[in-house]
Design a protein with these regions (language model features):
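Adenosine-nucleotide cofactor-binding segment
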Residues: 1-56
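A polyampholytic, Gly/Pro-enriched intrinsically disordered region
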Residues: 25-28, 95-96, 118-124
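Short, solvent-exposed polar/charged micro-motifs at secondary-structure junctions
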Residues: 36-37, 108-110, 133-134
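Short leucine-rich amphipathic alpha-helices used at interfaces
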Residues: 40-41, 69-70, 120, 126
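Flexible, charged surface loops at secondary-structure boundaries
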Residues: 40-44, 63-66, 134
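Glycine-rich phosphate-binding loop and adjacent beta-alpha segment
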Residues: 52, 56-116
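C-terminal capping/lid region of NAD(P)-dependent oxidoreductase domains
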Residues: 112-134
Length: 134
């Protein structure tokens, strides 16, 4: 990606993600509010990855994605009928993918990121405590 935008729901999360430096821009909005998401993002993006743990975020993700772009739904809270019907209702020409959660070696890669990338480790331990990344 040429630019990474993180969308978070609270000022606390905004401060954490901004401090981490992992995103080029951090915006705050309720992911369940499609109009607020679109306004916060501004210019639609090429790829949207949905990894929230609350239902009702499908339409915001679709609105945030540029025509011809891709939405990756990587959340067990996703309603795929809502996503499909929402894309049709919004006249959105986007590709929608389902993240299945498993890729060979994914656990090792995730742990390696926490161990070797200071920004990822700091963001992780700011939520879980310093001993959790050991």
């Amino acid at each position: 990606a040429s630019r990474v935008i993180g969308l978070v729901p609270t000022a606390e999360e905004e401060a954490r993600l901004t401090a981490s430096g992992l995103a080029d821009a951090v915006v705050r909005a309720d992911a369940r509010d499609p109009v607020a998401v679109a306004a916060a993002i501004g210019e639609p993006v090429d790829v949207t990855v949905v990894c929230v743990d609350v239902p009702g975020c499908e339409h915001g993700a679709i609105l945030a994605t540029a025509p011809g772009g891709t939405v990756v739904f990587f959340s067990m809270a996703t309603s795929f009928p809502a996503a499909a019907l929402g894309a049709e209702g919004l006249a959105a020409d986007v590709t929608m993918l389902i993240g299945n959660g498993y890729v060979p070696g994914h656990a090792e890669t995730a742990l390696d990121l926490v161990r070797t990338e200071p920004a990822v480790r700091a963001l992780f331990t700011s939520r879980t405590g310093p001993d959790s990344a050991e």
